[in-house]
Regions:
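RNA substrate-binding interface of SAM-dependent RNA methyltransferases
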Residues: 5, 108-210
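Short acidic-hydrophobic, aromatic-tinged amphipathic segments that line or gate anion-handling sites
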Residues: 4-11, 80-85, 176-187, 248
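Short, aromatic/basic amphipathic alpha-helical patches
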Residues: 67-78, 240
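Boundary-proximal intrinsically disordered activation/regulatory segments immediately upstream
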Residues: 1-68, 156-157
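A glycine-rich helix N-cap at a beta->alpha junction
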Residues: 75-94
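Active-site/ligand-binding-proximal alpha/beta "capping" segment
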Residues: 203-254
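Structured adenosyl-cofactor binding patch, chiefly the S-adenosyl-L-methionine
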Residues: 103, 141-145, 159-173, 238-274
Length: 274
């Protein structure tokens, strides 16, 4: 039977992970084994469970217990299920987007890029992308369009932050990912060196005098290719572009010279992931 706990006070400590803790507090960088993340909606929670993530607690409207969330509850063992009236839960930021169900999961132990990429042919590498919506959208495209892994540099948004998980529709649990380096100083020098040591050629998505079209045959012929994508505003750092094996552009019309990084990633993954 589900371990149901009734909540009658919005300030109850059981709601802290869902209502009051910041992303950094949830992540618990100093004690990563205590870190958690929040997944929202039955579909996203199911994908986390499918991927083997450990549920810590759930929060849902009462009507969900015998409704759409009933199957999820059978998979969560004795994790406490906090429940309350919709009127109380409506005070949670973004609750309307959750379909009435949230779940706190234990963060997994970090994995190394080398471990993830042993058999990978195509990987996405994200540099300094801090917008969680873009990170989530990139993961969704990576899952749909044949990327074997996603690597992020230390200045990127956490892929397990709440909005990134939501926008990815749970695909962040399906695509293996790892952080490439411990501090911003490890990128691009050490990060690109590690990619080369793993056998990858690197393709910087950027406009420059030496950019080749994304359908260039040499790119398709590479046995292992890392597609490097930059921050929303300024794009990739000049040092990153200069250090990559290729600089790649997407041919465009009507005088447009760039796309949002999430849109550009989808085009790049479709063309280069085939």
């Amino acid at each position: 039977m589900p371990n149901i706990v009734e909540i009658t006070d919005f300030h109850a400590p059981e709601l802290d992970p869902y209502a009051r803790l910041t992303q950094n507090q949830l992540r618990c960088r100093l004690e990563p084994e205590k870190g958690i993340f929040i997944a929202e909606s039955p579909k996203v929670i199911s994908r986390a469970l499918d991927a083997g993530y450990e549920p810590v607690s759930l929060l849902m409207e009462r009507r969900q217990i015998t409704g759409p969330a009933a199957e999820i509850l059978t998979r969560c063992g004795d994790a406490p299920v906090y429940t309350a009236d919709r009127e109380l839960l409506a005070g949670l930021t973004g609750f309307e987007l959750t379909r009435g169900v949230l779940c706190a999961f234990r963060r997994p132990a970090p994995r190394s890029a080398e471990e993830l990429c042993k058999a990978a042919r195509r990987v996405a590498v994200l540099e300094g992308i801090v917008d969680s919506t873009n990170v989530g959208a990139i993961f969704l495209s990576a899952a749909a369009l044949n990327m074997d892994a996603v690597l992020i540099n230390p200045s990127c948004c956490d892929p397990l932050c709440r909005r990134a998980v939501r926008v990815s529709m749970g695909t962040v649990f399906q695509v293996p990912w790892a952080q490439l380096g411990e501090t911003p100083a490890d990128w691009p020098g050490q990060g690109l060196a590690r990619l080369r040591a793993m056998g990858f050629k690197t393709a910087a998505m950027a406009l420059s005098d030496r950019s080749v079209p994304i359908d260039d045959e040499a790119l398709a012929a590479e046995p292992k290719l890392a597609i490097v994508l930059g921050t929303e505003g300024d794009g990739l750092a000049h040092a990153t572009i200069a250090a990559c094996d290729y600089t790649v552009k997407i041919p465009m019309s009507h005088g447009v010279d760039s796309l949002n990084v999430a849109a550009a990633s989808a085009v790049a993954f479709w063309q280069l992931g085939r």
